[in-house]
């Protein structure tokens, strides 16, 4: 069961979520795959679920230390600065669905968790600043499978109402380009063959009609 600290995270603002996988079952599954040497990806959205996952990862490192384990936090909706420090210390990676910030933060701020927390969804800037390998994904069909659209959200953090949400978490265009290319390749264990243009790697590239590093950031999703 969640400990006292975890329960406080859940009730401090009178909001709570639901476990799609119970803490006991999650730990059981993670332990089995960790000890078998697998790379583990955990889908986690809330900060309570994130804390549980990080606590389990710490247990696994205590039981059987592993380096370059590639443990990845998928979706990464809500987090705290302390949790980001833990992610870095534990050597985990982040694969965030940044599109949810664009699509859901306005409704969340009005009728769900409040503006402050809604604006801090997908803290990509903090992850980059902490030196965490961070990428973004679409979660298709839940969001468009369009990397440049994800890049646009990561750089501008504009929701569908036109509001900038959590401007301090914006990525630079270069960081966002890394997030949809080489960082993504690291997350799936393919950085040695794809994700960047280098001698010996696959000739895996796209020709665009604008330079995403120099164009107007608001036009990123319109690049053809």
Q: What are these model-predicted stretches?
A:
Residues 79-93:
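Short amphipathic alpha-helices and their capping/turn segments at secondary-structure boundaries
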Residues 1-11:
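Single conserved hydrophobic/aromatic residue that forms the stacking wall/gate
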Residues 12-22:
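Active-site mouth loops of central-metabolism enzymes
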Residues 5, 93-95:
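Short, solvent-exposed beta-strand-terminating loops
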Residues 24-29:
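Short, acidic/polar
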Residues 31-41, 48-71, 75, 85, ...:
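His/Asp/Glu-enriched, well-ordered alpha-helical/loop segment
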């Amino acid at each position: 069961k969640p400990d006292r600290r975890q329960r406080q995270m859940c009730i401090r603002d009178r909001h709570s979520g639901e476990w799609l996988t119970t803490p006991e079952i999650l730990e059981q599954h993670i332990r089995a795959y960790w000890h078998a040497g697998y790379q583990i990806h955990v889908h986690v959205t809330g900060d309570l679920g994130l804390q549980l996952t990080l606590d389990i990862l710490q247990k696994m490192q205590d039981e059987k230390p592993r380096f370059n384990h590639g443990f990845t936090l998928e979706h990464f909706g809500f987090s705290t600065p302390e949790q980001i420090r833990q992610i870095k210390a534990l050597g985990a990676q982040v694969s965030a669905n940044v599109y949810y910030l664009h699509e859901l933060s306005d409704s969340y701020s009005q009728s769900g968790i409040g503006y402050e927390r809604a604006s801090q969804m997908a803290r990509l800037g903090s992850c980059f600043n902490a030196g965490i390998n961070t990428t973004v994904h679409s979660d298709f069909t839940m969001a468009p499978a369009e990397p440049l659209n994800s890049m646009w959200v990561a750089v501008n953090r504009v929701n569908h109402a036109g509001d900038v949400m959590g401007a301090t978490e914006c990525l630079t265009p270069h960081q966002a380009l890394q997030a949809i290319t080489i960082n993504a390749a690291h997350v799936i264990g393919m950085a040695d063959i794809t994700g960047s243009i280098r001698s010996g790697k696959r000739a895996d590239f796209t020709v665009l009609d604008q330079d995403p590093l120099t164009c107007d950031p608001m036009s990123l999703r319109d690049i053809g």
